[in-house]
Regions:
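Intrinsically disordered, low-complexity segments enriched in small residues
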Residues: 1-92, 96-365
Length: 365
């Protein structure tokens, strides 16, 4: 196990930040992330509270393998009373944010209360500050992340933020990290917005230590020996989770036209093969490459573009500015994104699905 044995508690109402010992018996019993975060939430939050009240808490929980070299060791969970369901919400993400929080020295981050004005949290190892975020409120995720790195003069900072969706109370708003990875379920971004917390920026330099480095390396090597030659791993590396669209369509379980059907006749225009087909306009495919989260040997993340001649990415933007930003490569389609905006809506236009995916990442929903 690689616990840091520290919990960072931030009260936005009082503006206080404190470090306390991790409840090791809870960590042992509930393992970390979703389990450990849910235990803290159940012990500290009255189940009758309004999810959007200051009495609710938002917990970012890492696990015993987070920030280690264990395969997929970069994941973390956001735990709170969910805005969408009113039940315990545990939303998991990849990317780099959870590992950075752990390397800053914290197993959990517990956020309490509500700030009077918009703020962001800056964590650099033991240095923790609550800073004004007036300039950021109303900005998108895509604007917030680069602004914070410039402001903090810390290009290696990892950032989790909300977009406009979380600010205005969209019930299914997300917390987005690394521009296109998300704590995406149950309205955890809505809870963050209700606390007037725009973003959390973290830079960790402390690293992590495991109890027995030699045995741990041995265990990781054994796991990698199974993962690397696995045909399933290879398929997800080459095709991403998008690969599941063909699988579910074949077995008659692809949600189509608001679940009135279970197969989609237009699947070949939007599946994991379609993203590799060169466009007529510029000879380039939608898929530009793949990317991996922290310590992940799978690399199922996609990087995608939209046809630069499409009307979707040209002309004036109703939200202000220029649509040209959507011509740049960004996070590509995952299976659930692809089916939800594709077959579920009866849409077989790949550019349109990518565009809506970009919008959701940008606005944090």
């Amino acid at each position: 196990m690689a616990w840091q044995n520290r919990v960072l508690r931030v009260n936005l109402t009082s503006g206080s930040c404190s470090i306390e010992a991790l409840q090791r018996d809870w960590a042992q019993a509930y393992l970390g992330q979703r389990g450990l975060g849910s235990k803290y939430l159940a012990e500290e939050v009255d189940p009758r509270v309004d999810p959007l009240s200051p009495e609710n808490k938002l917990i970012i929980a890492t696990g015993p393998l987070t920030a280690t070299t264990a395969p997929t060791g970069g994941r973390s969970s956001a735990v709170t009373k969910g805005a969408l369901t009113g039940a315990i919400a545990a939303s998991n993400t990849g990317g780099m944010f959870g590992a950075e929080l752990k390397m800053a020295g914290y197993d959990l981050l517990i956020i309490e209360g509500r700030a009077e004005q918009p703020v962001y949290l800056w964590i650099r190892d033991d240095q923790v500050e609550i800073r004004p975020a007036d300039q950021l409120w109303g900005q998108s995720v895509w604007e917030t992340e680069p602004w914070l790195r410039r402001e903090l003069q810390e290009p290696q900072a990892k950032i989790a933020s909300i977009g406009r969706a979380g600010e205005v109370g969209v019930k299914f708003a997300c917390i987005v990290n690394d521009m296109d990875r998300a704590y995406g379920r149950s309205g955890v971004g809505t809870v963050m917005g209700s606390k007037h917390l725009k973003a959390i920026a973290v830079r960790g330099t402390r690293g992590v230590k495991v109890a027995d480095a030699d045995r741990f390396r041995e265990a990781v090597s054994g796991t990698m020996a199974i993962l690397q030659p696995s045909p399933v791993r290879k398929r997800f590396t080459s095709r991403g989770t998008h690969n599941m669209m063909d699988v579910t369509n074949q077995f008659g379980s692809l949600p189509t036209r608001n679940c009135r059907d279970v197969k989609f006749e237009g699947v070949e225009a939007i599946n994991a093969d379609a993203v590799r087909v060169p466009r007529r306009s510029d000879g380039k495919p939608s898929l530009q490459g793949n990317k991996a989260c922290f310590a992940c040997p799978i690399g199922c993340g996609r990087v995608a573009t939209i046809d630069p001649t499409s009307g979707l990415v040209n002309g004036a933007d109703p939200q202000g500015g220029d649509r040209g930003r959507y011509k740049l490569p960004s996070g590509g389609l995952e299976y659930e994104t692809a089916f939800a905006f594709g077959p579920m809506c009866g849409v077989d236009d790949l550019d349109a699905i990518n565009y809506v995916n970009f919008l959701c990442n940008e606005q944090g929903m």
